[in-house]
Amino acid sequence: MANRVATPDPDIPLTQRETQVLRHMALGLSNKEIAQSLTISVETVKEHVQNILRKIAVTDRTQAAVWAVRRGLV
């Protein structure tokens, strides 16, 4: 995955780290794989995932991935 720097976008209500996690989710990575890639704990990834789902008002990872693709994050 290319290392993209998330730029603040008022239409995307996520932190830079949440955006990174969402990109990884959209590529189909597991929580463990995301944690290893971003050098954070699996528990931190889980927290970010829950925050992402809440902030973008979706109920699962698949819907979050679709949301990310539609906004050009992936």
Region locations from a protein language model:
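Regulatory hinge/linker segments at domain boundaries
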Residues: 1-24
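Hydrophobic patch in the ABC ATPase nucleotide-binding domain
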Residues: 14, 58, 73-74
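Short, basic, alpha-helical segments at the C-terminal edge of helix-turn-helix-like DNA-binding modules
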Residues: 61-71
